[in-house]
């Protein structure tokens, strides 16, 4: 599914500063040389001076620099990239996961099953920017986060953000932000007396679009938490989710907060702990053994917490169904969480919570320095391939690459490979497709066909509405 937004709707969104469209498109002003998010608080430009772009990278490629007031590089990504199963959607998910930084455009093309020239042509034709420009925009954003939230030396930040040289880093920052790295750091809004050191972790604001039902996500994570790699602590409404992460260059530990100062009581009453975030972010802190993993770690957290979803489109569609309408009205912004590690989730979906804890205790790599109850990494597929039966077969398929569940995997191919494994039932396969592959349009076996068709293309969200029962409803 592709959001087709006509020019009149776009300009009206800019004129009314409509945050619902942040990340769905960007606009640039010819007379100022600046590009913005639709909700930018600056004076509305004349229609004749406005240009529209599908991505920040396209605006940058056209010579526009990021607005310092609205920081368009910090908005949630378009929900289309989660929905779409075509080459452009898959490419955008992989670029977000850092594939171009690690493997270059040839590596991206191999993963997509196309030539590098075909990938360049398709992305440029639709998005106005090729894979290099898209990755460059992402590197610039990562660098800004590190410059403005840590006291790391500029040289370390350049390589941590994925730049090949300090000169390339300096040139990109000047082009995108019209500031030197030092000036960009000095322009950071102050949230305290001093920036944290790397040992204290990197503070993050994980932006989301529209209302966000944080309590439902944290309820699910608490129910699923596996001893040794995850924990959820604190009172409901003010919980902290913590987990270990296996990343391309090293390991990480993240803490994500449920509470947010912009939270509001859910419609229809309910306690203050059943908060709906009304647009904004989740606060997080990330500890990494290798800072080159920052971009990948952030993208995996965004998928786990479903932060790039479009709750307005989801709620409009599902709210038209009589069965779901009262649930949607009472729970705006309900999300369909994904997975921080798709391979890990597939194994957990198969063996269950207790089985996963057993695998962690037996095969998991022990952290060099335990952090409270977080003591292990979940075992890599190769470490589990000797397990008997279906778990071993699943692990072997993941390890040898015959089954791919990464951000850019073809969902239909992955489902076919899962179904070919002995002992995986249809419900487990559907759950893996929904959570590990991040498919927003999955129906579990047993739902009435007519109802399921009415929920397209958001069937995964419909199932979350039907499955989740907050304590007051139980």
Per-region residue spans from a language model:
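HhH-family (HhH-GPD) DNA N-glycosylase catalytic core used in base-excision repair
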Residues: 1-474
């Amino acid at each position: 599914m592709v959001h087709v937004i006509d020019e009149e709707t776009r300009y009206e969104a800019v004129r009314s500063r409509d945050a619902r469209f942040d990340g769905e498109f960007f606009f640039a002003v010819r007379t100022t040389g600046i590009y913005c998010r639709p909700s930018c608080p600056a004076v509305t430009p004349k229609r004749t001076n406005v240009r529209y772009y599908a991505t920040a990278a396209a605006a940058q490629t056209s010579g526009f620099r990021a607005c310092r007031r609205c920081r368009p590089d910090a908005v949630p990504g378009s929900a289309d990239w989660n929905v779409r199963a075509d080459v452009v959607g898959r490419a955008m998910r992989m670029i977000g996961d850092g594939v171009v930084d690690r493997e270059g455009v040839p590596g991206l093309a191999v993963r997509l099953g196309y030539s590098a020239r075909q990938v360049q042509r398709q992305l440029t034709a639709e998005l106005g920017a090729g894979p290099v420009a898209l990755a460059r925009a992402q590197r610039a954003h990562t660098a800004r986060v590190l410059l403005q939230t840590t006291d790391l030396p500029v040289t370390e930040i350049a390589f941590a953000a994925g730049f090949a040289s300090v000169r390339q880093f300096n040139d990109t920052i000047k082009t995108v932000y019209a500031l030197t790295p030092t000036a960009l750091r000095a322009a950071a809004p102050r949230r305290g007396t001093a920036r944290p050191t790397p040992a204290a972790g990197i503070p993050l604001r994980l932006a989301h679009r529209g209302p966000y039902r944080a309590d439902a996500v944290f309820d699910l994570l608490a129910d699923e938490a596996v001893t040794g790699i995850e924990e959820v602590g604190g009172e409901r409404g003010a919980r902290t989710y913590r987990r270990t992460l296996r990343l391309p260059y090293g390991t990480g530990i993240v803490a994500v907060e449920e509470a947010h100062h912009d939270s509001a009581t859910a419609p229809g009453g309910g306690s203050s702990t059943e908060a709906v975030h009304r647009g904004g972010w989740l606060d997080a802190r990330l500890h990494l053994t290798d800072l080159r993993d920052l971009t990948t770690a952030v993208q995996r957290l965004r998928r786990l917490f479903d932060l790039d979803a479009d709750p307005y489109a989801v709620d409009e569609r599902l709210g038209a169904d009589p069965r779901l309408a009262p649930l949607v009205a009472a729970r705006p912004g309900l999300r369909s969480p994904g997975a921080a590690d798709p391979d890990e989730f597939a194994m957990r979906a198969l063996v269950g919570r207790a089985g996963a804890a057993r695998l962690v205790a037996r095969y998991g790599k022990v952290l060099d320095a335990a952090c409270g109850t977080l003591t292990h990494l979940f075992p890599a597929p190769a470490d589990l391939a000797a397990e008997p039966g279906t778990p071993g077969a699943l692990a072997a398929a993941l390890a040898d690459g015959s089954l791919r569940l990464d951000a850019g995997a073809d969902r239909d191919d992955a489902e076919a490979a899962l179904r070919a494994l002995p002992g995986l039932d249809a419900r487990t396969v559907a759950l893996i497709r929904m959570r590990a592959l991040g498919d927003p349009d999955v129906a579990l076996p047993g739902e009435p066909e007519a109802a399921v068709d009415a929920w397209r293309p958001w069937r995964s969200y419909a199932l979350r509405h039907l499955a989740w029962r907050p304590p007051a409803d139980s």
